[in-house]
Amino acid sequence: MKRLNIIIITILICALSQAQIPPYRNGQRLTDYNFPLFGDVKTIEYTCFSINTDTGEEYPRDTTIIRFNKNGDVEYINPYVDLTYTDVVYPAELRFLYNNLGYNTLTREVIDYDYMDVVYDTYYTYDEDWRRIKGENYNEDGKLLYTEEYTYDRQGNLTHEKSNKGGELVVYTYDTNMNIILIERYIGDKLVEKTNRTYNENGKLIQETTYSSNRLNEMEISETTLYSYGENGVLISSETKSPIHEMFLQYITDSRTEITDRTTYKCDSYGNVIEETYYPNNSTSPQFRIEYKISYR
């Protein structure tokens, strides 16, 4: 079981770059690049490298290209990793179509299975304020597979994402500065995960604490992440602590040891993240490095 967990974590880190809650514009997910973007970005090409902790030698694992249109909206992602199945990873591509007002009306997903390509189309509808309120996902035979619904508060902030695919509901709560301070994820009526966010006086995220439901249906801390910034407000590092890992280590060693996963960041002159390096389990040797090549218009 421990080995399986390591494999899944490796896939998530490389494919989604330690994805957190994705950024949204008009109720739509923008990219798998999970940092604020500055400047007139044309493309982002990022590659994840595994690092031999003994020799320091790097091995490229996968590369993703994200292309933006002149309005700053993502129009193409290829390839990304489809995580529909935990035992097999399939490359796929996403294409985003926009109407003449610049709103995403169709997202096409093409998954490259070994024997054929499978196409899924998601059509979006908007309210009178051009906020996305519904998504309908169809297979290539035109069969409706699932729907998504989005609701907003009076300030236009996305507050609820509801999908009949697995009965999932995500609820967002904001502070007076429109920062997300609480994220709750439900399966049916059951709260399965929640994340509290804390910001500094400049509106920078400085702490995330995630709680998960245990076997007794009690919420317990699964991890806490602390973010550090430089004098110019640029993200430079983050540290993630997991009490669950601490308790496991205490059980097998009969001693209390704090486990900390650390990530460091490098930014370009625009303030965009161009590199992140991941150090697991109190290690001084990195295990993964993600390199972002950003081109500008």
Features from the language model and the residues they span:
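Buried hydrophobic residues that stabilize the cores of well-folded domains
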Residues: 20-297
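Bacterial Sec-dependent N-terminal signal peptides
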Residues: 1-25
